[in-house]
Amino acid sequence: AGRGHKRGLKIVMDLVVNHTSDEHAWFEASKNKDDEHADWYWWRPARPGTTAGEPGAEPNQWGSYFGGSAWEYCPERGEYYLHQFSKKQPDLNWENPAVRRAVYDMMNWWLDRGVDGFRMDVITLISKRTDLSGKLPGEYGSELDDLPVGEEGYSNPNPFCADGPRQDEFLAEMRREVFEGREGFLTVGEAPGVTAQRNEHITDPGNGELDMLFLFEHVDFDCEGTKWKPLPLDLPKFKSIMAGYQAAVKNAGWASLFTGNHDQPRVVSRWGDDSSEESRVRSAKAL
């Protein structure tokens, strides 16, 4: 970081704390029900009356963003763990204060070494909706109903995981425990499931959460179910969405501006014309 600062650069790290690798020491320890890390992830038993590890035994019918079930059976523990993304990326249990403390300690470690901030991967998925007994929607005995299953045979977990009930609490706690007393840092959150109106609250400096968010309505509106089946660009609708972003933060907060990222098709191919070198260059300049 020091050498970057000498060149007038700021170092913003990618921070992934909704989940870890399944090879992380925390997860390896969590496979043991008697270990202090036992409750650091979302572990659940097979549904009653089913055989663990067999189709239909998953705790609920949630599907993964990457396809298939959002639950993976772990023979060592004899239970399933939740992964909204790859089975190699088990979700951390942010309801556990020890998990949050470990995350904050890690963030402080990097800031103490000169990092200038964090781009927080899917940070708005850290708070899951549960009933009063801690059960997820659709789980056996849960008071919360799940959504209907789709064509692939799974339900959508996003309404129960995005912008969850304790998200503001967690982000404000992070701000206090990591950034209080520091100056010159940046926090920007990747925010699936967050509206422009909620962006105002989260990025309002008075609420002490994040500085900026990456919202996705403007890069999702032209897709027919999947980003790989784009519809023709509706420019008036695009302009309306972008204007809505700005209007929502006219009194407080910040809007971020981007037209694509590593999860999106390249913008020249998507909204421009790359059929020839000339049209590709013109499109790239325009976009």
Name each region found by the language model.
Residues 1-287:
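Active-site and adjacent substrate-binding regions of carbohydrate-active enzymes
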